[in-house]
Amino acid sequence: MLLLIALLQGCATQLAPRPGSAPHDADAAPEALVLRFQNSSIAPAGDEAVMAPEALQPGDILLTSMSGFTSVGIRLMTFAPVSHAAVYIGDRQVVEAVGSGVRVRGIEEVLEEETVILVLRYPDLSAEQARNIKDYALKKSGTGFNYLGVTLQIPLSISRRLCELPLVPSALRDACIRSMGVISQVAASESRLFCSQLVLQAYRHAEVPMTDADSRLISPADILHMREGDVSSVRIHRELRYAGHLKYPTPTMVALQR
């Protein structure tokens, strides 16, 4: 039944070591492997998962969603519960790419406006790498928004579901998505940025590439699936760690949003 649902949704899968076995064991016996499905749940594990802004670290990635039309449309298009990505640069400041361009916002404003805020953290990020991420993000402040890149994400988000069918090997899935994104790579600007593109580019500038895939192909949903225990649609260098939620609605609010 789970496999049938995954087939209908184009849900990516991956054979992974069974919990408790040695990680990254290429010679693991088939019985030591389990079929892992892409996970779209972002519900916190409990009250302990809700973090204070003071616990944020420079370089943290904020994945968010709102109740507005644009956010809902992006979530429907990408089959994910998040619609926006931003990077925390320290000093209670966040850099993000929105319709008006790349801007700096205070964390208090982000907390007030967003409905859900999930925080992912790149493991073992050094202070120097975090500074380079900050420098790049601030340098891009005022840069125009990549409207064409976002527009081209619409057909790509639909067509790439073929690449994400269950049991498609990760290497083939990665190559398939890259090939389908050729038009985006040729037509979409690299000088203008949309939200997840900014995050990927900032990390790449700091010589900590999250993936070798073109940043114009990556959506906030793709970043979500780069977390530990999930199945990334594209090949990644390191899994992102879940740091916690800055904000998550009560069950009543979740029911109303649905």
Residue spans of the language-model regions?
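Cysteine-nucleophile amide-bond enzymes
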Residues: 10-258
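Bacterial N-terminal signal peptides
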Residues: 1-10
